[in-house]
């Protein structure tokens, strides 16, 4: 497989699991929390790399700690970071994910950021 250039988003997934999804106004005690890389562009880049491609990702990040996580994960996954763009005003994107641990149903709020 040849060189692949992926244009797309990078967001930091902030995922929590609980016994059920909260209804408006309800607070639910969660059972677990995970933070990790996500976003359509990043996920496509990972898949292309696993299929044997030489992958670079074009995405925009904020100048924040989540950008460092993005850079580290891209390098760890063997993807080039030479095409990363940075915003001085906007933060790196985030996805707030709440997962029902019994049914696997979820609710997601995306803050696109940079």
Regions found by a protein language model. Give the residues of each.
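Conserved N-terminal subdomain of the carbohydrate kinase-like
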Residues: 26-27, 35, 50-114
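Glycine-rich phosphate/adenosyl-contacting loop at the front of the ribokinase-like
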Residues: 1-60, 67-69
């Amino acid at each position: 497989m040849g060189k692949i250039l992926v244009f797309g988003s990078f967001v930091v997934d902030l995922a929590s699991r609980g016994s059920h999804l909260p209804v408006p106004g309800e607070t639910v005690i969660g059972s677990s929390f995970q933070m990790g890389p996500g976003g359509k562009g990043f996920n496509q880049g990972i898949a292309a790399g696993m299929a044997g491609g030489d992958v670079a990702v074009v995405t925009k990040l904020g100048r924040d700690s989540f950008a460092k996580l993005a850079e580290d994960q891209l390098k760890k996954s063997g993807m080039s970071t030479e095409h990363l763009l940075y915003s001085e005003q906007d933060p790196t994107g985030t996805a707030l994910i709440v997962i029902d641990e019994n049914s696997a149903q979820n609710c997601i709020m995306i803050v696109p950021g940079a």
